[in-house]
Amino acid sequence: MNTKEYKTFLSYCKASIDEKPLTISFDDFDDLSHSVFSNPHKIKQKASEIRKKFIDNIDENLLIFERKFTENGGKVHWCVSYDDFIDSLSALLAKNKIKAVNTFFSRFNTELGLEFSLKNEKIATLATDGKCAIFEPEFGIVNTGSLFSIFNSAYDMEIVMGSKLKIFIIPINKFVCNIAEIDIMSTLLSIYRNQNDSPFLSSIFTPNSHKDSASHVFLIDNGRSNILASKTHRKALWCIDCDACKRVCPVFNTIGDKPYNNVFTGPYANVVLPFYENFDSYKHLSFNSVGCGNCTRVCPVNIPLTDLMIENRRFFFEKKIMDLGDELLCSRLKKFLLSRREMNKKTWLKRRKIKVFIKSSVLKNRNTPAFAKQSFNGLKIQK
């Protein structure tokens, strides 16, 4: 891995590691789910089934949502990338002669570069006339064509719901199939994102109930469909953006946000960024893990993040996306470790060969992997 992104990532990581020690403990994480639910593991399983049901039929479900939302009096815009979104949004604002909008911070807004784009279009982002608001709901609801939103304050809710032109932006994976599923998903989101047992202030918006205003929703892909082709990797799209995985990740809590140089950070970024952006620039993130499994254990929708990082490594190797040096090293190690003849040799000899395979710079601050004194094969022969 000899890319500019990888070198920058390493430089930031080294600076962070020098400042604080690495620990894999997450005993201080206050998991309220055990006090809210009698069986939190069952609830997590139910939530993962809800997300899987939508993602496995995402194309059909999104078309149903479009039909329902349109029937309710709203307008749906499809956007493949953030460029498509910005172009469509600019055209919509120009058509309605909007010179100022109310925007609200969200990671998706940052991903799309919304504030920067509006500034370039000379559109103010703090309106006082109540004409237009741009907001990201938490979930779309397929069977009713509605949008479920959580607000930070009653004032924010009043601004959004009171605007004459309501513009909602939502990634294509943040939907549930029916309104009954909102209860579980919103409670889990509140617990794992905000450490509260229920959302502070929420609303379900259906265009038909606001006939005095225009409602538009932008369904935005922005790389998410790249991951749908793999039945294994598509599990990452179950994510509800709670960030619980970050709080328990020893690597993230050591290096922080800065090395990623992206709106996506932490274990989730390690899995999806190579697909959302490009393999060459972000494949190194899939090796950015100690394999402790904390992120997998804490995830409220049971995304196997640790397994997906390992699956990414296998995918890169099989598709020959690895750098030549790394590919040769992996091939040699694989051949060595799968050889019965080699594994039956004495421990000190195997240890010495590993040192030959792995550069001394890698082993500078860590011990050489240790082999057991006797292999399973040797034990079986003795018996």
Identify what each model region corresponds to:
Residues 2-30, 311, 325-383:
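Intrinsic disorder at enzyme termini
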Residues 81, 245, 304-305:
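Helix N-cap / loop-to-helix initiation motif
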Residues 239, 243-246:
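Phosphate-binding glycine-rich loops and their immediate beta-loop-alpha structural context
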Residues 1-232:
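The feature marks the mature, well-folded catalytic cores of soluble enzymes
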Residues 209-236, 252-359:
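Ferredoxin-type iron-sulfur electron-transfer modules in oxidoreductases and energy-metabolism complexes
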Residues 108-111, 245, 295:
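Residues at the N-terminus of the alpha-helix immediately C-terminal to the conserved SAM/SAH-binding loop
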